[in-house]
Amino acid sequence: MMEVELTEMLDTLNQYPPFSEMQEPHLIEQMVHELEIQYVRNGESIIVPNTMNEFLYFIRSGAVEVLANNEQLLRRMEEGELFGYLSLLRDGKVTQEIKAIEDCLLYLIPATWFKRFYVENDVFSEFFELIRENRLRTALDAQNQNSNQDVSLMTCPVKSLLRRPPISIEDNVSIQQAA
C-alpha cells in the first residue's frame, strides 16, 4: 500500500476507541502495515458459524448485522465499530453470522495483533470486556422484559423458589446414614 493510504487508515483508526485511547501510537502504526482491506456488498455474509476467524474487523464504512444461529437479529453495527473479537477470544471459533446490510469497506486486523494488544494493553482489553459486559446486561434486560413471571429467576432470592422446607440433618450424621 502507498504511504498516503496507510496514513489515512491510521488516522481513521485513531478516531475510534480503543485505538484513540491507546498510548502506543508506534504499535498501531506497525499494525496498520499488516491490515487487509475488504469490500463486501450488501447482503453478503462476512463471517459464518462453524468456521474459523483470523481477523478483528473494523467497519470503515457501511453497516452489518449480527445474527444468532436461528437467524435472530442480535444487533447492528456501523462505521467505527469492531466485530470478530468474540471468536478471536475463542481461538477463532465462529458461532454467529455477520452479514452486510449496506455495502461495506472493512479493515481486517490480523488476530496476532488483536491477541497482542489484548494481553499487553489494559485500555484495549478493558474496551472489549466492557462491550461483553454491556451485551450480557442487555441480554438479561431482554430476558427480564420477556419473562411472564412476576420475579425473574436470575434475580430472585432462593427462598422464593422453595416450595417446602429444606431437608436438614445434624452435623454429626454420616453421609451413609443420611442416605
Question: Where are the regions a protein language model picked out?
Answer:
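Cytosolic regulatory regions built on CNB/CRP/Popeye-like sensor folds
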Residues: M1-P165, Q176
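The conserved cystathionine-beta-synthase
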Residues: I169-A179
